[in-house]
Amino acid sequence: KAPFDIRLQIRDEGLILNDSGGRSIHFEPLFPGEISYSRSESLWLARGGVAAQHSSQPLSALWQVLPEDVRLSPHVYLATNSLQGPWWILSWPERVPGADEVLPPEPPAYRVLTGVVDGFGRTLAFHRAAEGDVAGAVTGVTDGAGRRFHLVLTTQAQRAEVFRKQRATSLSSPAGPRSASSSLVFPDTLPAGTGYGTDNGIRLEAVWLTHDPAYPDEQPTAPLARYT
């Protein structure tokens, strides 16, 4: 399972890995190619920057399944909780630079999950929305075969608006229901917090295949999956 909410804070005094379970795991700053292990959380955190690890490093074999550009980049961090993988790639989302922006821009002081590499070298790349109601959320996935998938996300406010329109249509119909259920309310927002932290109300509605290299001229007319 990919921890989509995993986030790495990069500070002068150290690194803080936050996950969707509410954990904040602290590490010392890492030099390029260095790997640190948290015994309390059974988690490794690594920094790219070397082509290979020393044979005495327990993760040396797993390191070699990573794409070369990931292994060699000191700006990329990686995490894993198993010697068999997968690696969680921590980088920053793609974005279009501004017209007056100095290139290349400085890397931000945080990293988010941008990909997964399993123990056999198979990859998934995650693409996040740059703007809009779901900015920052994963809305696209590219697998190792080059297939691209679009994840349709909705917010609580969008679902509430759809509910109100459907309810209004139903009540205006001669055959529409006239019962106490017509007073049902679909809130625009969710409670501020839950036992699992803040719920942003974003939900996955459907998954579409948008490109398949094996069938480049064919596009599905229905989603691969739909969630209600």
Which residues make up each language-model segment?
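Surface-exposed recognition patches
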Residues: 1-228
